[in-house]
């Protein structure tokens, strides 16, 4: 499969990181985040489709997709900080943009091409295995054991060879420690069986799972564990930045209608994040219609009509008003589409 990363997305991300408005320790670069999250979700869906199991239920799928966002956010935080560290020269002066870009392109290329491709391929495998595991749980009354199948790789590694053809019950603690997919690009597999269990194989340190692959995505819904270096060895501020971003995503999703699928809601959230960034807007405190119309959020707002018992204007309830001499139409009408409640000029009569 052809794998690429948008040059335009990378360009926008570099411009954003270089700008004074961006804070790499406390924010997540949205252009990179959305692109990487979308690719990880694509990998997950590809993995689900390769499994012969029934498609995982929506709650489990949503957990996988949301955790892909968490992984992507930590990856971006690492990447943006690795590049931001090179912004200043030895004298503490900001480098010219073109010079800085030349210095950080190797970092960017490594993260969004070489490593991202490896992460994508591994995510496909582990999503496939997660779907399989859900099916194993559904069939455990008939097929209570799991069998480790040999690698299909042309050049299989030696680390998993001792586990080939091992058969253990699905709830055996062995599967908490070792599973196909706990090495990068592992091509081993599992199958459910009613064959009798075999003895536990010998183990040594060479057989340990690689960091970030030491969990079972079929039970926790994470294609990469919390022990991945992006998270376990994150730069300062990463956890707070990721938590803040995920809280905003969860907030947006909670406000969307129930007829949308989780996948559709997350896609809309991605789009909303881009809009918020592009327009430099953020959600404020809730405001009722009256407050919004009266522009109470703006302490300098001036009303066009003010109450006056001797005023010549009256509303439908009999209240009298006069024109406010301090009102300036050009200055004090903030929106051309402003909707009036009483007293609206349309409701006043002389």
Predicted regions and their residues:
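Short, glycine/acidic-rich hinge or "gate" loops at secondary-structure transitions
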Residues: 95-100, 113-117, 136-140
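N-terminal "first-domain core" detector
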Residues: 104, 108-116, 124-132
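Conserved short secondary-structure elements within globular domains
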Residues: 122-196, 331, 335
């Amino acid at each position: 499969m052809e794998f690429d990363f948008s040059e335009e997305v990378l360009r926008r991300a570099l411009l954003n990181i270089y700008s004074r408005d961006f804070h790499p320790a406390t924010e997540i670069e949205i252009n990179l985040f959305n692109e990487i999250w979308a690719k990880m979700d694509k990998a997950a869906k590809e993995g689900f489709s390769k499994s012969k199991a029934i498609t995982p239920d929506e709650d489990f799928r949503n957990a996988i997709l949301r955790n892909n966002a968490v992984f992507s956010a930590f990856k971006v935080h690492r990447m943006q900080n690795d590049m931001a560290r090179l912004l200043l020269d030895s004298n503490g002066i900001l480098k010219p943009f073109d010079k800085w870009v030349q210095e950080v392109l190797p970092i960017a290329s490594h993260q969004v091409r070489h490593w991202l491709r490896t992460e994508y391929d591994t995510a496909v495998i582990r999503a496939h295995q997660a779907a399989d595991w859900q099916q194993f749980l559904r069939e455990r009354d008939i097929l209570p054991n799991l069998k480790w199948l040999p690698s299909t790789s042309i050049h299989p590694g030696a680390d998993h060879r001792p586990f080939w053809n091992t058969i253990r019950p699905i709830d055996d603690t062995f599967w908490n420690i070792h599973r196909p997919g706990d090495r990068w690009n592992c091509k081993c597999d599992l199958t459910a069986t009613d064959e009798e269990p075999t003895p536990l194989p010998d183990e040594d340190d060479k057989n340990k799972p690689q960091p970030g692959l030491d969990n079972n995505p079929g039970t926790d819904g994470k294609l990469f564990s919390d022990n991945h270096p992006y998270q376990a060895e994150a730069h300062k501020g990463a956890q707070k930045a990721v938590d803040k971003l995920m809280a905003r995503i969860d907030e947006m999703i909670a406000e969307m209608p129930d007829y949308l699928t989780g996948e559709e809601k997350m896609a809309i959230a991605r789009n909303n994040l881009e809009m918020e960034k592009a327009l430099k807007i953020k959600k404020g405190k809730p405001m009722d219609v009256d407050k919004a119309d009266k522009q109470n959020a703006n302490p300098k707002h001036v009303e066009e009509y003010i109450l006056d018992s001797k005023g010549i204007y009256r509303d439908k309830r009999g209240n009298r008003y006069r024109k406010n001499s301090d009102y300036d139409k050009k200055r004090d009408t903030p929106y051309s589409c402003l909707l009036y409640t009483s007293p609206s000029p349309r409701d006043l009569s002389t």
